[in-house]
Amino acid sequence: MSEQQRQGAERDLYRDTWVRYLGYANEVGEAFRSLVPAAVVWLSYGVSSSYVLADAIDKGKKAGEVPSPEAGRNTRMALAVVDTFVWQSLASVAIPGFTINRLCAASLYVLGTMTHWPPTVRKWTTTTLGLLAIPVIIHPIDRSVDFLLDSSLRKLYPSVEKPSTP
């Protein structure tokens, strides 16, 4: 097998392709909250949540494909699904969504009280700030969620069966 084929076989659809960006849909929705109907924001959460669920199921299936004694297979699959689902729910949906929501709400408030800009300019400025913040918050949130899970949920896993960090 060539190096390129081997890399292609190891490529994770949910982590190494454009599909990963579906996990950021809710952050984009939150950034645009002041400009779009609430239903659009909720739809963005639906997209992100679907991504999280699909990734968790995929990791469970992959854990089940690892050759090992059948007795540990179900446990390994369950741990992979739970770990991925919790990690992705926190790192891709809940924490970034809350962060962008609060950043945009605060910036809209500050712009409203400290400037005389028209509402449309304030809203677009807020949206721009929210969008620009997304790449800045991703890695600190990911590392924080790693630390949180390593310090809590992952301590409950059997030592041999710890899933790899998403």
UniProtKB/Swiss-Prot annotation:
Keywords: Apoptosis, Membrane, Mitochondrion, Mitochondrion inner membrane, Transmembrane, Transmembrane helix. Coiled coil: none annotated. The modification N6-succinyllysine is found at K123. The chain crosses the membrane at residues 34-54, 78-98, 129-149. The keyword Cell wall biogenesis/degradation does not apply. GO terms for biological process: apoptotic process; mitochondrial fission; mitochondrial membrane organization; mitochondrion organization. Belongs to the MTFP1 family. Involved in the mitochondrial division probably by regulating membrane fission. Loss-of-function leads to apoptosis. This is Mitochondrial fission process protein 1. It comes from Mus musculus. The gene is Mtfp1.
